[in-house]
């Protein structure tokens, strides 16, 4: 065995098995490529990305850990998102969206002014 080596079985490993998946249409409105990592809170991604941020609140990309998705300028594509798990608290990242993803009352923070107040989020559907 090599230090750090991971030995797996012969069968493929299914990622996000049994997790609810939602599809979101994303367009890069900027003039530079944007890359988003696997476990980044997608609703707080680069403001140049135009998509339904309220729908993406509390979700991450449905891709293997350690990978990323690149959005080229002017290109529109569908992506799949899965809910962030664990304690559902996002520290850091964008300060406007940091903290618990779910309000104590059971309502989502995205349903309050918090999501609209994130600087750089512009216009309908962004």
Curated annotation (Swiss-Prot):
> Which Enzyme Commission numbers does its entry carry?
3.5.1.5
Q: What class of enzyme is it?
A: hydrolase
Q: Name one GO cellular component term.
A: urease complex
An example molecular function term from Gene Ontology annotations: urease activity
Q: Which NCBIfam families match?
A: PRK13203.1, urease_beta
Family, similarity comment: Belongs to the urease beta subunit family.
What's the protein name?
Urease subunit beta
Species this chain originates from: Frankia casuarinae (strain DSM 45818 / CECT 9043 / HFP020203 / CcI3)
Instruction: Write the lineage as a comma-separated list.
Output: Bacteria, Bacillati, Actinomycetota, Actinomycetes, Frankiales
